[in-house]
Curated annotation (Swiss-Prot):
It comes from the Bacteria. This is S-adenosylmethionine synthase. Its EC number is 2.5.1.6. L-methionine binds at E57, Q100, D240, K271. It is an enzyme of class 2 (transferase). Residues 100-110 are annotated as: Flexible loop.
Protein backbone atom coordinates (compact mmCIF):
# COMPACT_ATOMS: atom_id res chain seq x y z
CA UNK A 1 0.00 0.00 0.00
CA UNK A 2 1.29 3.48 -0.86
CA UNK A 3 2.32 5.76 1.99
CA UNK A 4 1.59 9.46 1.47
CA UNK A 5 3.01 12.29 3.51
CA UNK A 6 3.32 16.06 3.22
CA UNK A 7 6.32 18.18 4.11
CA UNK A 8 6.63 21.97 4.04
CA UNK A 9 9.67 24.26 3.99
CA UNK A 10 10.00 28.03 3.69
CA UNK A 11 12.57 30.51 2.44
CA UNK A 12 13.00 34.27 2.51
CA UNK A 13 14.49 36.74 0.05
CA UNK A 14 17.75 38.66 0.37
CA UNK A 15 15.62 41.68 1.35
CA UNK A 16 14.08 40.00 4.39
CA UNK A 17 15.29 41.84 7.53
CA UNK A 18 17.00 38.78 9.04
CA UNK A 19 18.77 38.10 5.76
CA UNK A 20 19.95 41.71 5.51
CA UNK A 21 21.58 41.16 8.90
CA UNK A 22 23.14 37.85 7.81
CA UNK A 23 24.56 39.43 4.66
CA UNK A 24 26.05 42.37 6.57
CA UNK A 25 27.69 40.03 9.09
CA UNK A 26 29.20 37.88 6.32
CA UNK A 27 30.28 40.91 4.27
CA UNK A 28 32.24 42.15 7.29
CA UNK A 29 33.76 38.67 7.72
CA UNK A 30 34.77 38.56 4.04
CA UNK A 31 36.37 42.01 4.19
CA UNK A 32 38.46 40.96 7.18
CA UNK A 33 39.50 37.63 5.59
CA UNK A 34 40.76 39.49 2.50
CA UNK A 35 43.39 41.12 4.73
CA UNK A 36 43.81 38.53 7.48
CA UNK A 37 42.96 34.90 6.70
CA UNK A 38 43.51 33.79 10.28
CA UNK A 39 41.35 36.42 11.98
CA UNK A 40 38.91 35.36 14.66
CA UNK A 41 35.54 36.86 13.79
CA UNK A 42 32.09 36.71 15.38
CA UNK A 43 29.91 39.53 14.04
CA UNK A 44 26.22 40.04 14.80
CA UNK A 45 23.97 42.61 13.12
CA UNK A 46 20.63 44.17 14.01
CA UNK A 47 18.66 46.25 11.51
CA UNK A 48 15.58 48.29 12.31
CA UNK A 49 14.00 51.48 11.00
CA UNK A 50 16.82 53.78 9.91
CA UNK A 51 19.66 52.05 11.76
CA UNK A 52 22.07 49.11 11.52
CA UNK A 53 23.91 47.99 14.65
CA UNK A 54 26.99 45.79 14.20
CA UNK A 55 28.39 44.08 17.30
CA UNK A 56 30.57 41.14 18.22
CA UNK A 57 34.12 40.06 18.89
CA UNK A 58 37.02 40.25 16.44
CA UNK A 59 40.74 39.54 16.78
CA UNK A 60 42.59 40.70 13.66
CA UNK A 61 45.37 42.81 12.22
CA UNK A 62 42.99 44.04 9.49
CA UNK A 63 41.24 47.38 9.25
CA UNK A 64 38.02 47.54 7.27
CA UNK A 65 35.66 50.40 6.47
CA UNK A 66 32.71 48.97 8.33
CA UNK A 67 30.34 51.82 7.53
CA UNK A 68 30.92 51.50 3.78
CA UNK A 69 30.54 47.72 3.91
CA UNK A 70 27.17 48.03 5.64
CA UNK A 71 25.91 50.68 3.24
CA UNK A 72 27.02 48.70 0.18
CA UNK A 73 25.20 45.56 1.33
CA UNK A 74 21.95 47.38 2.05
CA UNK A 75 22.03 49.35 -1.22
CA UNK A 76 22.95 46.32 -3.35
CA UNK A 77 19.94 44.45 -1.98
CA UNK A 78 17.74 47.30 -3.18
CA UNK A 79 17.07 49.40 -0.09
CA UNK A 80 18.02 52.83 -1.44
CA UNK A 81 15.05 54.95 -0.40
CA UNK A 82 12.91 55.49 2.65
CA UNK A 83 9.93 54.86 0.34
CA UNK A 84 11.06 51.22 0.08
CA UNK A 85 11.46 50.98 3.84
CA UNK A 86 15.20 51.47 4.34
CA UNK A 87 17.91 53.64 2.80
CA UNK A 88 21.46 52.32 2.89
CA UNK A 89 22.79 55.73 1.89
CA UNK A 90 21.46 57.57 4.93
CA UNK A 91 20.74 55.02 7.68
CA UNK A 92 22.56 55.31 10.97
CA UNK A 93 25.32 52.78 11.66
CA UNK A 94 26.48 51.88 15.15
CA UNK A 95 29.69 49.87 15.60
CA UNK A 96 30.13 48.06 18.92
CA UNK A 97 32.65 45.38 17.91
CA UNK A 98 35.16 44.40 20.59
CA UNK A 99 38.04 41.93 20.94
CA UNK A 100 37.66 38.18 21.44
CA UNK A 101 38.30 36.90 24.95
CA UNK A 102 41.89 35.68 25.49
CA UNK A 103 40.36 32.77 27.43
CA UNK A 104 38.84 31.53 24.16
CA UNK A 105 42.07 32.16 22.25
CA UNK A 106 44.08 29.92 24.58
CA UNK A 107 41.56 27.12 24.05
CA UNK A 108 41.65 27.37 20.26
CA UNK A 109 45.18 28.34 19.23
CA UNK A 110 47.94 25.70 19.24
CA UNK A 111 51.63 25.55 18.33
CA UNK A 112 50.76 22.89 15.73
CA UNK A 113 47.88 24.15 13.55
CA UNK A 114 46.38 20.67 13.13
CA UNK A 115 45.86 20.54 16.90
CA UNK A 116 43.65 23.65 16.82
CA UNK A 117 40.79 23.17 19.25
CA UNK A 118 37.13 23.77 18.50
CA UNK A 119 36.10 27.37 19.12
CA UNK A 120 33.18 26.22 21.24
CA UNK A 121 31.30 23.13 22.30
CA UNK A 122 28.30 22.13 20.24
CA UNK A 123 26.56 19.68 17.97
CA UNK A 124 26.11 20.02 14.22
CA UNK A 125 24.14 18.09 11.63
CA UNK A 126 24.70 17.44 7.94
CA UNK A 127 22.10 15.99 5.59
CA UNK A 128 21.59 14.83 2.01
CA UNK A 129 18.94 12.93 0.09
CA UNK A 130 18.63 11.77 -3.50
CA UNK A 131 15.25 13.41 -4.14
CA UNK A 132 16.72 16.35 -6.13
CA UNK A 133 19.67 16.78 -8.46
CA UNK A 134 21.53 18.77 -5.79
CA UNK A 135 20.88 16.00 -3.21
CA UNK A 136 18.73 18.28 -1.06
CA UNK A 137 15.11 18.05 0.14
CA UNK A 138 12.73 19.31 -2.53
CA UNK A 139 10.62 21.66 -0.35
CA UNK A 140 13.55 23.89 0.66
CA UNK A 141 15.13 23.82 -2.82
CA UNK A 142 11.86 24.94 -4.45
CA UNK A 143 11.25 27.57 -1.76
CA UNK A 144 14.70 29.06 -2.38
CA UNK A 145 14.15 29.10 -6.13
CA UNK A 146 10.91 31.06 -5.76
CA UNK A 147 12.48 33.92 -3.80
CA UNK A 148 15.59 33.86 -6.01
CA UNK A 149 13.28 34.33 -9.00
CA UNK A 150 11.48 37.15 -7.17
CA UNK A 151 14.79 38.98 -6.75
CA UNK A 152 15.75 38.31 -10.36
CA UNK A 153 12.42 39.66 -11.65
CA UNK A 154 12.77 42.73 -9.43
CA UNK A 155 16.38 43.56 -10.26
CA UNK A 156 16.09 42.92 -14.00
CA UNK A 157 13.09 45.23 -14.30
CA UNK A 158 10.80 42.42 -15.45
CA UNK A 159 8.48 43.26 -12.54
CA UNK A 160 9.66 46.75 -11.55
CA UNK A 161 6.94 47.21 -8.92
CA UNK A 162 8.41 44.46 -6.73
CA UNK A 163 10.30 45.47 -3.59
CA UNK A 164 13.07 43.54 -1.80
CA UNK A 165 11.23 41.80 1.04
CA UNK A 166 9.62 38.43 0.24
CA UNK A 167 8.86 34.99 1.70
CA UNK A 168 8.02 31.66 0.10
CA UNK A 169 6.71 28.31 1.29
CA UNK A 170 6.26 25.03 -0.58
CA UNK A 171 4.40 21.89 0.56
CA UNK A 172 5.50 18.73 -1.25
CA UNK A 173 3.60 15.44 -1.36
CA UNK A 174 5.67 12.29 -0.94
CA UNK A 175 4.73 8.76 -1.93
CA UNK A 176 6.94 6.01 -0.54
CA UNK A 177 9.61 8.60 0.17
CA UNK A 178 9.60 10.16 -3.32
CA UNK A 179 8.24 13.57 -4.29
CA UNK A 180 5.15 13.15 -6.48
CA UNK A 181 3.58 16.61 -6.36
CA UNK A 182 3.26 20.06 -4.83
CA UNK A 183 0.17 20.53 -2.67
CA UNK A 184 0.57 24.20 -1.71
CA UNK A 185 2.61 27.25 -2.66
CA UNK A 186 2.81 30.47 -0.65
CA UNK A 187 4.57 33.58 -1.95
CA UNK A 188 4.33 36.93 -0.21
CA UNK A 189 6.20 39.78 -1.84
CA UNK A 190 6.61 43.43 -0.98
CA UNK A 191 5.46 45.78 -3.74
CA UNK A 192 4.92 49.44 -4.47
CA UNK A 193 1.45 50.86 -3.73
CA UNK A 194 0.47 51.46 -7.36
CA UNK A 195 0.10 47.82 -8.44
CA UNK A 196 -3.35 46.25 -7.98
CA UNK A 197 -3.63 42.93 -6.18
CA UNK A 198 -5.19 41.31 -9.25
CA UNK A 199 -2.32 42.39 -11.50
CA UNK A 200 0.25 41.40 -8.89
CA UNK A 201 -1.22 37.94 -8.40
CA UNK A 202 -1.42 37.28 -12.14
CA UNK A 203 2.15 38.44 -12.80
CA UNK A 204 3.62 36.59 -9.82
CA UNK A 205 1.80 33.41 -10.79
CA UNK A 206 2.94 33.47 -14.42
CA UNK A 207 6.42 34.99 -14.15
CA UNK A 208 7.59 33.65 -10.79
CA UNK A 209 5.61 30.60 -9.65
CA UNK A 210 4.96 28.82 -12.96
CA UNK A 211 8.33 29.94 -14.31
CA UNK A 212 10.12 28.34 -11.35
CA UNK A 213 8.28 25.24 -10.17
CA UNK A 214 8.41 21.99 -12.20
CA UNK A 215 5.18 21.69 -14.19
CA UNK A 216 5.03 17.94 -13.60
CA UNK A 217 4.69 18.53 -9.84
CA UNK A 218 1.81 21.01 -10.14
CA UNK A 219 -1.72 19.60 -10.41
CA UNK A 220 -5.31 20.78 -10.49
CA UNK A 221 -5.61 20.67 -6.70
CA UNK A 222 -2.40 22.59 -5.95
CA UNK A 223 -3.25 25.55 -3.72
CA UNK A 224 -1.67 28.93 -4.48
CA UNK A 225 -1.52 31.72 -1.91
CA UNK A 226 0.02 34.86 -3.41
CA UNK A 227 0.10 37.78 -0.96
CA UNK A 228 -2.78 36.13 0.92
CA UNK A 229 -3.21 39.07 3.33
CA UNK A 230 -3.47 41.52 0.42
CA UNK A 231 -1.33 44.66 0.48
CA UNK A 232 2.38 44.26 1.39
CA UNK A 233 3.84 47.75 0.87
CA UNK A 234 5.62 48.21 4.20
CA UNK A 235 8.44 45.69 4.53
CA UNK A 236 12.11 45.29 5.28
CA UNK A 237 13.50 46.63 8.56
CA UNK A 238 10.56 49.04 8.94
CA UNK A 239 8.14 46.13 9.05
CA UNK A 240 10.27 43.85 11.23
CA UNK A 241 13.53 44.03 13.15
CA UNK A 242 16.23 41.89 11.52
CA UNK A 243 18.86 39.87 13.39
CA UNK A 244 21.80 37.73 12.32
CA UNK A 245 21.24 34.01 12.80
CA UNK A 246 17.46 34.00 13.02
CA UNK A 247 16.87 31.98 9.84
CA UNK A 248 18.89 28.85 10.61
CA UNK A 249 16.30 26.45 9.18
CA UNK A 250 16.06 28.46 5.95
CA UNK A 251 19.87 28.39 5.87
CA UNK A 252 20.05 24.61 6.18
CA UNK A 253 17.51 21.91 5.25
CA UNK A 254 14.12 23.52 5.70
CA UNK A 255 13.34 21.40 8.76
CA UNK A 256 13.84 18.06 6.99
CA UNK A 257 16.96 17.40 9.07
CA UNK A 258 17.74 18.24 12.66
CA UNK A 259 19.74 21.34 13.57
CA UNK A 260 22.29 21.83 16.33
CA UNK A 261 21.12 25.39 16.96
CA UNK A 262 24.25 27.31 15.97
CA UNK A 263 23.92 29.97 13.30
CA UNK A 264 26.42 30.36 10.46
CA UNK A 265 26.71 33.99 9.36
CA UNK A 266 29.36 36.30 10.77
CA UNK A 267 31.55 33.44 12.04
CA UNK A 268 35.03 32.58 10.78
CA UNK A 269 35.84 28.90 10.08
CA UNK A 270 37.38 28.30 13.52
CA UNK A 271 33.78 28.34 14.76
CA UNK A 272 32.55 24.76 14.36
CA UNK A 273 28.95 26.00 14.32
CA UNK A 274 29.76 26.92 10.75
CA UNK A 275 32.69 24.84 9.53
CA UNK A 276 31.53 21.53 11.03
CA UNK A 277 28.01 22.04 9.67
CA UNK A 278 29.57 22.54 6.23
CA UNK A 279 31.69 19.43 6.76
CA UNK A 280 28.59 17.50 7.82
CA UNK A 281 26.88 18.43 4.57
CA UNK A 282 30.02 17.41 2.63
CA UNK A 283 30.12 14.02 4.34
CA UNK A 284 26.39 13.33 3.97
CA UNK A 285 26.31 14.42 0.33
CA UNK A 286 29.23 12.17 -0.57
CA UNK A 287 27.63 9.23 1.24
CA UNK A 288 24.46 9.66 -0.84
CA UNK A 289 26.39 10.35 -4.05
CA UNK A 290 28.35 7.13 -3.44
CA UNK A 291 25.14 5.14 -3.22
CA UNK A 292 25.75 4.06 0.38
CA UNK A 293 22.30 5.42 1.29
CA UNK A 294 19.41 7.31 -0.29
CA UNK A 295 19.13 9.62 2.73
CA UNK A 296 21.79 10.41 5.29
CA UNK A 297 21.94 12.59 8.37
CA UNK A 298 25.24 12.88 10.22
CA UNK A 299 25.79 14.40 13.65
CA UNK A 300 29.16 15.58 14.95
CA UNK A 301 29.89 17.19 18.30
CA UNK A 302 32.82 19.04 19.84
CA UNK A 303 34.23 20.27 23.14
CA UNK A 304 35.78 23.73 23.33
CA UNK A 305 39.54 23.60 22.94
CA UNK A 306 39.53 19.94 21.81
CA UNK A 307 40.39 19.04 18.21
CA UNK A 308 38.84 15.60 17.79
CA UNK A 309 35.03 15.39 17.62
CA UNK A 310 33.49 14.02 20.80
CA UNK A 311 31.07 11.97 18.68
CA UNK A 312 30.14 11.05 15.11
CA UNK A 313 26.82 9.36 14.39
CA UNK A 314 24.86 8.53 11.24
CA UNK A 315 21.17 7.96 10.50
CA UNK A 316 20.18 6.65 7.06
CA UNK A 317 16.46 6.17 7.79
CA UNK A 318 16.55 2.57 6.59
CA UNK A 319 17.86 3.49 3.12
CA UNK A 320 21.43 2.26 3.67
CA UNK A 321 23.09 -0.28 1.36
CA UNK A 322 25.77 -1.10 3.95
CA UNK A 323 25.47 -1.02 7.74
CA UNK A 324 25.49 2.33 9.54
CA UNK A 325 28.43 1.05 11.60
CA UNK A 326 30.36 0.54 8.35
CA UNK A 327 29.40 4.04 7.17
CA UNK A 328 30.67 5.62 10.40
CA UNK A 329 33.93 3.66 10.06
CA UNK A 330 34.31 4.90 6.47
CA UNK A 331 33.59 8.48 7.53
CA UNK A 332 36.38 8.31 10.10
CA UNK A 333 38.76 6.86 7.50
CA UNK A 334 37.98 9.23 4.62
CA UNK A 335 37.21 12.53 6.40
CA UNK A 336 39.31 14.33 9.02
CA UNK A 337 36.78 16.29 11.07
CA UNK A 338 39.18 18.20 13.31
CA UNK A 339 38.55 21.98 12.94
CA UNK A 340 41.86 22.79 11.23
CA UNK A 341 41.52 19.79 8.92
CA UNK A 342 37.99 20.88 7.95
CA UNK A 343 39.30 24.33 7.06
CA UNK A 344 41.94 22.77 4.81
CA UNK A 345 39.66 20.07 3.36
CA UNK A 346 37.04 22.62 2.31
CA UNK A 347 39.51 25.47 1.65
CA UNK A 348 37.55 27.86 3.84
CA UNK A 349 40.03 30.72 4.34
CA UNK A 350 38.69 32.86 1.50
CA UNK A 351 36.12 35.70 1.28
CA UNK A 352 33.32 33.35 0.20
CA UNK A 353 30.76 33.91 2.91
CA UNK A 354 28.47 36.72 1.77
CA UNK A 355 27.44 34.47 -1.13
CA UNK A 356 26.11 31.95 1.39
CA UNK A 357 24.03 34.45 3.35
CA UNK A 358 20.90 34.35 1.16
CA UNK A 359 19.07 31.46 -0.54
CA UNK A 360 20.62 28.72 1.58
CA UNK A 361 24.09 27.49 2.44
CA UNK A 362 23.47 24.05 0.93
CA UNK A 363 22.43 22.75 -2.46
CA UNK A 364 24.34 25.54 -4.18
CA UNK A 365 26.70 25.21 -7.15
CA UNK A 366 30.45 25.68 -6.54
CA UNK A 367 31.78 28.63 -8.56
CA UNK A 368 35.23 29.98 -9.30
CA UNK A 369 35.58 33.48 -7.84
CA UNK A 370 38.33 36.08 -7.64
CA UNK A 371 38.51 38.80 -5.01
CA UNK A 372 41.56 41.00 -5.48
CA UNK A 373 44.44 38.59 -6.01
CA UNK A 374 42.66 35.70 -4.29
CA UNK A 375 41.11 33.09 -6.61
CA UNK A 376 39.09 30.31 -5.01
CA UNK A 377 36.04 28.04 -5.28
CA UNK A 378 32.83 28.81 -3.41
CA UNK A 379 30.53 26.19 -1.84
CA UNK A 380 33.29 23.58 -1.72
CA UNK A 381 31.20 21.45 0.65
CA UNK A 382 28.89 20.71 -2.28
CA UNK A 383 31.56 18.72 -4.14
CA UNK A 384 31.15 14.95 -4.39
CA UNK A 385 34.84 14.21 -4.91
CA UNK A 386 34.94 11.65 -2.06
CA UNK A 387 32.08 9.52 -3.40
CA UNK A 388 34.31 7.18 -5.43
CA UNK A 389 36.61 6.60 -2.42
CA UNK A 390 33.65 5.81 -0.18
CA UNK A 391 32.09 3.47 -2.73
CA UNK A 392 35.34 1.60 -3.28
CA UNK A 393 36.03 1.28 0.44
CA UNK A 394 32.49 -0.05 0.96
CA UNK A 395 32.99 -2.65 -1.76
CA UNK A 396 30.08 -1.44 -3.88
Amino acid sequence: MSEYSLFTSESVSEGHPDKIADQISDAVLDAIIVQDKHARVAVETLVKTGVAIVAGEVTTSAWVDLEQIVRDVICNIGYTSSDVGFDGNTCGIINIIGKQSPDINQGVDRAKPEDQGAGDQGLMFGYASNETDVLMPAPIVLSHRLVERQAEARKSGLLPWLRPDAKSQVTCRYENGKVVGIDAVVLSTQHNPEISQADLQEAVMELIVKHTLPAELLHKDTQYHINPTGKFVIGGPVGDCGLTGRKIIVDSYGGMARHGGGAFSGKDPSKVDRSAAYAGRYVAKNIVAAGLAERCEIQVSYAIGVAQPTSISVNTFGTNKVSEETIIKLVREVFDLRPYAITRMLDLLHPMYQDTAAYGHFGRTPQQKTVGEDSFTTFTWERTDKAADLRAAAGL
